[in-house]
Curated annotation (Swiss-Prot):
SUPFAM superfamilies: Trimeric LpxA-like enzymes (SSF51161). One of its GO terms (biological process) is lysine biosynthetic process via diaminopimelate. Pathway: Amino-acid biosynthesis; L-lysine biosynthesis via DAP pathway; LL-2,6-diaminopimelate from (S)-tetrahydrodipicolinate (acetylase route): step 1/3. It comes from Staphylococcus haemolyticus (strain JCSC1435). Its EC number is 2.3.1.89. The keyword Transferase applies. Belongs to the transferase hexapeptide repeat family. DapH subfamily. Keywords: Acyltransferase, Amino-acid biosynthesis, Diaminopimelate biosynthesis, Lysine biosynthesis, Repeat, Transferase. This is 2,3,4,5-tetrahydropyridine-2,6-dicarboxylate N-acetyltransferase.
Length: 239
C-alpha cells in the first residue's frame, strides 16, 4: 500500500505555501496605452479582456486604470488558499467532472473518482478503487486496491492533531453509501461496511459490519458473490 505523507509534513507544506486568492476578471473598456503587469494572464480583444491574476496584483492595477474601465465582473472562488487542486495531467485514472482532488493526494492507476467526490491532501486512492459520488476522503485517509467507497461515505481525515492515526482501508473492501469511518480505524481486507454504518473500531478482515456504532453481523463468505463484486469494466480506460 502506498505510504501517505505524515501529518507533520502536511502541516509544514500548508504553513510554507504561498497563500493564493486568484481572480478571473472580465473587463470592458478602452485599453489603448494600458500596460498590463507581467503577472497577469490577459486574453481578448482591444476593448474586452479576460484577466487571470492574484487579488493583491489586481487592486493597484484597478486603482490606476479605473477611468478606462466601462464594465467589470470578478469571479473569486477562494481566499488565501494554501492547497491548489491536483494537476491531473499524468494521472492514469478516470476522474469525472466536479471531483475535488487537492495537491499531494495520490490517485493510483485505474482508480475512479466520481462527481462531487472530495479527496483531501495526503489521501491515497488505491489502484482500481472507486470513490463514488459525494464521498469524502479526509487528509491522509488511505485505501488499498479495488475498494469501493459508496456515495456520500466519509473516511475521516487526520491532520490535526498530528498524533492521530489515519483511516486505513485494506484491499477489496466495500463501503456502503453514507457510511462513516472514524479517525484511526483500520478496515481489514475483503470486509464490508453496510450503508449508513458509523465505524468507531477496527474491522477484521472478511467481516461484515453494520449499525451505529458498527458491529460485526456476519462474514463476507455468507454474502452472495454478486452482491460484493468489483466490476473491472468500470475501471477500464482507453486501450
Amino acid at each position: 500500500m502506498v505510504q501517505h505523507l505524515s501529518a507533520e509534513e502536511i502541516i509544514q507544506y500548508i504553513s510554507d505555501a504561498k497563500k493564493s486568492t486568484p481572480l478571473k476578471v472580465y473587463v470592458n473598456g478602452n485599453f489603448d496605452g494600458v500596460t498590463f503587469p507581467d503577472s497577469f494572464k490577459v486574453f481578448g480583444s482591444d476593448n474586452s479582456k479576460v484577466i487571470f491574476c492574484e487579488a493583491d496584483d489586481w487592486k493597484p492595477f484597478y486603482e490606476s486604470n479605473q477611468s478606462t474601465i466601462t464594465e467589470l465582473e470578478i469571479e473569486m472562488d477562494r481566499r488565501n488558499s494554501a492547497i491548489p487542486l491536483k494537476d491531473l495531467t499524468n494521472t492514469n485514472a478516470r476522474i469525472e467532472p466536479g471531483a475535488f482532488i487537492r495537491e499531494q493526494a495520490i490517485i493510483e492507476d485505474g482508480a475512479v473518482v466520481m462527481m462531487g467526490a472530495t479527496i483531501n491532501i495526503g489521501a491515497v486512492v488505491g489502484e482500481g478503487t472507486m470513490i463514488d459520488m459525494n464521498a469524502t476522503l479526509g487528509g491522509r485517509a488511505t485505501t488499498g486496491k479495488n475498494v469501493h467507497v459508496g456515495a456520500g461515505a466519509v473516511l475521516a481525515g487526520v491532520i490535526e492533531p498530528p498524533s492521530a492515526s489515519p483511516v486505513v482501508i485494506d484491499d477489496n473492501v466495500l463501503i456502503g453509501a453514507n457510511a462513516v469511518i472514524l479517525e484511526g480505524v483500520h478496515v481489514g481486507e475483503g470486509a464490508i461496511v453496510a450503508a449508513g454504518a458509523i465505524v468507531t473500531q477496527d474491522v477484521p478482515a472478511g467481516a461484515v459490519v453494520a449499525g451505529t456504532p458498527a458491529k460485526v453481523i456476519k462474514q463476507t463468505s455468507e454474502v452472495e458473490d454478486s452482491k460484493r463484486e468489483i466490476v473491472s469494466a468500470l475501471r477500464k480506460l482507453n486501450d
